[in-house]
UniProtKB/Swiss-Prot annotation:
Name the record gives this protein: 1D-myo-inositol 2-acetamido-2-deoxy-alpha-D-glucopyranoside deacetylase
Entry's EC annotation: 3.5.1.103
Signal sequence range: none
Chain positions recorded as Zn(2+) binding sites: H6, D9, H144
InterPro entries: GlcNAc_PI_deacetylase-related, LmbE-like_dom_sf, Mycothiol_biosynthesis_MshB
Entry note: cofactor: Binds 1 zinc ion per subunit.
Recorded coiled-coil stretches: none
Organism: Corynebacterium kroppenstedtii (strain DSM 44385 / JCM 11950 / CIP 105744 / CCUG 35717)
Function: Catalyzes the deacetylation of 1D-myo-inositol 2-acetamido-2-deoxy-alpha-D-glucopyranoside (GlcNAc-Ins) in the mycothiol biosynthesis pathway.
GO molecular function: N-acetylglucosaminylinositol deacetylase activity; zinc ion binding
Keyword line: Hydrolase, Metal-binding, Zinc
Region (Disordered): 369-388
Stated family: Belongs to the MshB deacetylase family.
Amino acid sequence: MAVHAHPDDEALWTGGLLAHLSRRGADVRVVTCTLGEQGEVIGEPMQGLIADEADMLGGFRYRELEDSLRILGVNGVHHRPCVLGGVGCWRDSGMVGTPSADHPRAFVKSGQQAVDALKALMSEFCPDIVVTYGPDGGYGHPDHIRAHEITHAAVAELPHTSAPELGGDNTDLFSAVLARRHGGRETSADHGIPDPVVLWAVRGETALKQAGRAISRIPDGWVAPSGMDFSFVDGAAGAVDSASSEKTPDKITEPDLAFVPDDLVDLAVQLSDADIEAQANAMAAHATQLWIADGRQSWTNPESAWAVSDPTVAPKVFALSNRIAQPLMREEHYVVAYGGSGPWAKTTPARYAYDSSVVRARGRSAFSLDQADEGAAHDTSEQSGQRR
């Protein structure tokens, strides 16, 4: 189960892992907490959907979410969105300090009701693994932080029956997921759920910077992220070294792209070409929010964009509405935050920070999911023909 704040987060933060596990036969559920009503819009045709005008962006993004879930192969055979509390229950709170956080349905005000709603979904689905963001929400968005809070609260409040064994090489973490559909476990809210492993989606510093340096040219009008030591080329403007001409080195306090130190990354999941393609297509389904620089167009955003990068390191380049160029990496990074049994178990939630008080997680361990689950008992998903 992946618990995400807005439509598009499932593809952007966890799309590679979700697509791969689905393709290999795991039952994958994405829970979306809001409809992203406060988002900006890429492309001129749909600008009128934003909250300050028609305020219809949430419904439009619901449809984009449907397409993304279908591409990733998750949320059952019909790939229907699972919106926490039901469609329209909670609203996008907007960025820090914006008036939208005062809306009576703002997700930051969801309280125990949101925890109870997530507990009900977990009791029904009985996940072995729960994926969300770290305590900072990945980049500080209030809804992402709230998703983290309710995820840990729900896991803590539900009764548990057992914990998946985590082997020293961490491959058993994903074997447990693939075995789940064959195990026939009977669980309920009364008897408890298997003690799930909680993962936080992050990006490790070295891999992100290496992928960024693999980009040699970005589209006209896009900008390079500040604080990352990248030097891209814009076909019209020449070298682009910063996300804003107003940002001089003495004004830059934080990088534009969020990352964590390498030693906080527990899992560096290597993605196949099929995983990357599924993730990129799922991201492109959110055309009002994400722009893939591979020439594709949509009726939402009819303007094409092209970037040049080393596909062995950064197979795609994308941007949000701010047009800051980012690499789509060949691996996804996760912190094992809580749960499980065996050598990798964590009985208290992990924490990460950028100061000496951080509770250090184990060092990075890269592996291929294809290799990790070769020969898994009853695993016939490679022959299932499931559509990507």
